[in-house]
Amino acid sequence: QHWSYGLRPGGKRNAKNVIDSFQEIAKEVDQPVEPKCCGCIVHQSHSPLRDLKAALESLIE
C-alpha cells in the first residue's frame, strides 16, 4: 500500500474510498508520458500499471 495514492495502512477502510483511489490511479496511468530529453510525447504501449488497472477493473465489475 502506498500513502501517496490515498491508501492508509492498518485499520478499516471504506470500500468506496478504496475504489475511488484505484480509479484515480487509473486516470493517471492513461495520461501520456512526457520525456524530459525531447519535446515529443510518448504513450507507453505496455506498462505494468496498465496490467494492474485491467485487473482492478475486472474486480470492480
UniProtKB/Swiss-Prot annotation:
* Gene that this sequence comes from: GNRH1
Pfam families with a match to the protein in the record: GnRH
Q: Name one GO biological process term.
A: regulation of luteinizing hormone secretion
Signal sequence residues: none
The UniProt entry's sequence similarity note says:
Belongs to the GnRH family.
Instruction: Give the top-rank taxon of the lineage listed in the UniProt record for this protein.
Output: Eukaryota
The UniProt keyword set, sorted, is: Amidation, Cleavage on pair of basic residues, Hormone, Pyrrolidone carboxylic acid, Secreted
Annotated compartments: Secreted
**Name the record gives this protein:** Progonadoliberin-1
Q: Which GO terms describe its cellular component?
A: extracellular space
Site (Appears to be essential for biological activity) location in chain: 3
State the function annotated in the UniProt record: Stimulates the secretion of gonadotropins; it stimulates the secretion of both luteinizing and follicle-stimulating hormones.
